[in-house]
Amino acid sequence: MTFSVDKVRADFPVLSREVNGLPLAYLDSAASAQKPSQVIDSEAEFYRHGYAAVHRGIHTLSAQATEKMENVRKRASLFINARSAEELVFVRGTTEGINLVANSWGNSNVRAGDNIIISQMEHHANIVPWQMLCARVGAELRVIPLNPDGTLQLETLPTLFDEKTRLLAITHVSNVLGTENPLAEMITLAHQHGAKVLVDGAQAVMHHPVHVQALDCDFYVFSGHKLYGPTGIGILYVKEALLQEMPPWEGGGSMIATVSLSEGTTWTKAPWRFEAGTPNTGGIIGLGAALEYVSALGLNSIAEYEQNLMHYALSQLESVPDLTLYGPQNRLGVIAFNLGKHHAYDVGSFLDNYGIAVRTGHHCAMPLMAYYNVPAMCRASLAMYNTHEEVDRLVTGLQRIHRLLG
């Protein structure tokens, strides 16, 4: 199937609107992607004509809603090439997925004197849960340092592992730098030391195919809203044998086998024992539509288009005076930058006046900001619906801001 950005854009209603009297150039998909009509319509249709509580209902609407929900689990397992749909837990998003692992697997397997390895480029969602776990149990948090070019100092990684290392928690793609980490060699090294590996895939799954079996990671987590799906829904993948050993994190309905006031409670099997309470069924339906939409376009075709657009953007940005780019030349999805000595908020505000939406701030990556000794950065992210013309508008806008602010 030939990729057509014009056809893709026609599926996204918001891209036809104007901001400040100018066509919207939405360059903030790394924060949250826009939604195609297919996703919006699927969720609306469910609420209009198919809504019911899932599980245990004997009536038609409940049975159909349950079947739709479980079909999305199957579709998601195929999307990331898992061995079984029962290795996937529905979560609110990447943050909840990581916290689930920290509070279930982590509380059961990490002890005083143990250590966990993360990197200096992590999103706070892959830092704070491990800090909290280490504080609870008396474990140590070790950090893979950054290089100035935005890659990790991988030569230090073997020195961080020892017999007390329980987990490597690493991002697949940096949400600030666009760096894609060499997961295969990192996962192999971790397993050689008996450690498990969690991969934060929030910034990866929309840009190219992911094969969790080939990666051999123990945990992989991502959000739906960055993948053109709804907010409030995501996927946590856990190897089946590992998942069946993990205790539940939250208690309530749907995750039990039996409840007795005198004899206590027993749990249902995984993955359902990690899905306490009424699920976000509408969000799950929308996620399924997003997976179907992206799969129909073809992730390889999307990757080819986006990489060509990224190369064009990096080339054109070289013409902007006093522009500092952060991250490696080979990157996925995002371009972080600062313009001269001007604060990122000021630059972002000017760009918004030109109808261009970028993200400004620390991007939930304060340790990374500290490494580069800046309080904030601007970040333009490129998605499958962005165009060369929008890149040109970004470049022209930055050139104009430089002239205005000096």
From Swiss-Prot:
Reaction equations catalysed: (sulfur carrier)-H + L-cysteine = (sulfur carrier)-SH + L-alanine; L-selenocysteine + AH2 = hydrogenselenide + L-alanine + A + H(+)
Any coiled-coil regions, as ranges: none
Superkingdom to which the source organism belongs: Bacteria
Main location (coarse class): cytoplasm
EC number(s) per entry: 2.8.1.7, 4.4.1.16
Co-factor(s): pyridoxal 5'-phosphate
A GO cellular-component term linked to this record: cytoplasm
Keyword annotations: Cytoplasm, Lyase, Pyridoxal phosphate, Transferase
Pfam families according to UniProt: Aminotran_5
Location of this chain's protein in the cell: Cytoplasm
Protein name per its UniProtKB record: Cysteine desulfurase
GN (gene name): sufS
